[in-house]
């Protein structure tokens, strides 16, 4: 799971996506995660980064919350930012955790950067107790494929705006310049790859959510103030359970 890019760009991630500055986290991801783990005492935030989701969970409901991430610079900042979270260094495909240790595992925008998907899902299933819940956030694998995005076609009158979908079925890794001089590696997989991976790991899919982009995101990205963007989900959430 460890990629040098996350050490290199840790400051960028912390500046742009944490500490309340990113509306998708504040208005959508964190509230959804809190809803899904409500009442569950032992929670693992896998790929915790600087820990904003883990902190939100422990602040809301207490309990025993662990944040694991393979990037040392992220974990160092997580520890500096405090909270009653237990942090550690680990990749998603080899967790230093005993079997059936957690009531819930949350993975947020992580596995689309991980090559070892099957091993990671197997580890998630291993550390969940029977009946435990897996909450899995990812960039929507159909609507956020490489080269997807809003297109304004000026070749017709009046101009037509639509959402272009890039190559969907091929499983491939790409490096995208997400901001000037910030290049991040993504692994695109079709949705069936994730669902079948859950099944192969022994997990049962219970719920799939495709929320519309939150108002704060639309307002922040002014060029996206169009119905085609408002009605095209950026996020996909899968909720699965380990059988009793």
Model-flagged regions — what are they?
Residues 1-39, 52-56, 74-77, 81, 133-173:
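Conserved class I S-adenosyl-L-methionine
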Residues 44-46, 50-94:
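Class I SAM-dependent methyltransferase SAM/SAH-binding core
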Residues 93-105:
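A short acidic, Gly/Pro-enriched loop at the edge of an enzyme's catalytic core
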Residues 104-117:
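A short SAM/SAH-binding and catalytic strip from SAM-dependent methyltransferases
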Residues 118-130:
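A short glycine-rich, Lys/Arg-flanked "PGG" loop and its adjoining helix->strand segment in the class I
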Residues 172, 185-208:
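Short alpha-helix
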Residues 197-244:
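C-terminal lobe and adjacent flexible extensions of AdoMet/dcAdoMet transferase-like proteins
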């Amino acid at each position: 799971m460890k990629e040098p890019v996350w050490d290199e760009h840790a400051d960028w991630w912390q500046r742009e996506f944490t500490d309340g500055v990113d509306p998708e986290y504040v208005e959508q991801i964190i509230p959804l995660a809190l809803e899904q783990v409500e009442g569950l005492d032992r929670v693992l935030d896998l790929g915790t980064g600087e820990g904003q989701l883990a902190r939100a969970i422990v602040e809301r409901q207490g309990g025993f919350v662990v944040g694991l991430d393979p990037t040392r610079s992220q974990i160092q900042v997580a520890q500096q930012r405090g909270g009653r979270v237990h942090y550690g260094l680990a990749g998603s495909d080899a967790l230093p955790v005993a079997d059936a240790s957690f009531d819930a595992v949350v993975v947020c925008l992580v596995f689309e950067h991980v090559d070892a998907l099957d091993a990671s899902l197997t580890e998630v299933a291993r550390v969940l107790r029977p009946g435990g819940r897996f909450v899995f956030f990812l960039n929507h694998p159909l609507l956020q494929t490489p080269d997807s995005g809003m297109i304004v076609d000026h070749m017709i009158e009046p101009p037509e705006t639509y959402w272009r979908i890039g190559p969907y079925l091929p499983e491939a890794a790409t490096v995208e310049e997400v901001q000037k001089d910030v290049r991040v590696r993504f692994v695109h997989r079709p949705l069936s790859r994730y669902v079948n991976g859950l099944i192969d790991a022994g997990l049962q899919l219970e719920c799939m959510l495709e929320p519309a982009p939150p108002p704060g995101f639309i307002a922040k990205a002014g060029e996206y103030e169009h119905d085609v963007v408002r009605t095209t989900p950026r996020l996909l959430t899968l909720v699965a359970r380990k059988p009793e």
